[in-house]
């Protein structure tokens, strides 16, 4: 939502922002597909055509589960401007990413490591080329 948009607008030219959601709740990716190349100003006027509530959102990464992505318009604008895309990951990818992330010594939650899940081979997004540099934000602390 707003955090992703702020991060994206703060990136230098040449960087792209990809957002990550899970198969159990991906309203942003669905809105992205439905919106296509619709003008940014139109997105707000036609909100209900593109951003519709997700039925029964569920995931181990529960901190990114919303029935709607409320700041989605800004996310779409940043992804379009930067050449990024929404990525949808499986629950297996969320679990594997969390296990990998914990090995860094950072007390990260499944939600906080969802960005790493977007880099795993099962992700729906663009693959990372050899030598390409990426940044991932671990944005949630595990409290369990």
Report each predicted region and the residues it spans.
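Buried hydrophobic packing segments
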Residues: 2-6, 28, 115-122
């Amino acid at each position: 939502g707003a955090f992703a948009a702020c991060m994206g607008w703060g990136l230098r030219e040449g960087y792209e922002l990809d957002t990550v959601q899970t198969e159990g709740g991906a309203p942003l990716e669905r809105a992205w597909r439905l919106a296509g190349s619709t003008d940014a100003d139109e997105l707000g006027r036609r909100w209900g055509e593109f951003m519709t509530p997700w039925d029964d959102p569920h995931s181990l990464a529960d901190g990114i589960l919303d029935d709607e992505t409320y700041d989605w318009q800004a996310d779409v604008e940043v992804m379009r401007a930067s050449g990024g895309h929404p990525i949808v990951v499986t629950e297996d990818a969320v679990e594997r990413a969390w296990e990998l992330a914990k090995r860094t010594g950072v007390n990260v939650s499944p939600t906080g490591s969802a960005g790493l899940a977007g880099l795993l081979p099962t992700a729906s997004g663009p693959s990372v080329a050899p030598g390409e540099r990426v940044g991932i934000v671990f944005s949630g602390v595990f409290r369990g």
